[in-house]
Amino acid sequence: MRLIMEAKGITPILNVSNIQATFAWFEKLGWQKAWDWGSPPTFGSVCSNKCEIFLCQNAQGGRGISALKVTAGVDGAEAADKGVWMSIWVDDVDKIHKHCLTQGIEVTYPPTNEPWNVREMHIRHPDGHVFRISHGLEESV
């Protein structure tokens, strides 16, 4: 099979209702604001190591509208309660869980050893986006 598109990376774009509040939410998790654009800012990015997430206030993404394309109904309301799910791989889920509790971040699923050999937990962003935070478990002998 001939390779048509060789991807060099992928960056999700999350639709958010308040970009400044979202920067602050990610900073509670130890992510850094990488940049923002506009005056006032309506587009920006957060990063952790080599991972980056774009943030777009009330436009691009599965819950918003933009001048280019309506992505969810006339005003975005059809998907207002539906966020994006993303997996984030870390070294220690339990450490992240404790940190989230101290920061007031909503934990929707506590750290659990899953049958697919992964320990994971879920947190929810105020706009409904869910982050599945996981680390692999060692194979049992």
What are these regions (language model features)?
Residues N18-K33:
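Amphipathic alpha-helical segments
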Residues T22-F26, C100, G128:
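Conserved active-site tyrosine of GNAT-family acetyltransferases
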Residues V130-I133:
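Short glycine-/small-residue motifs
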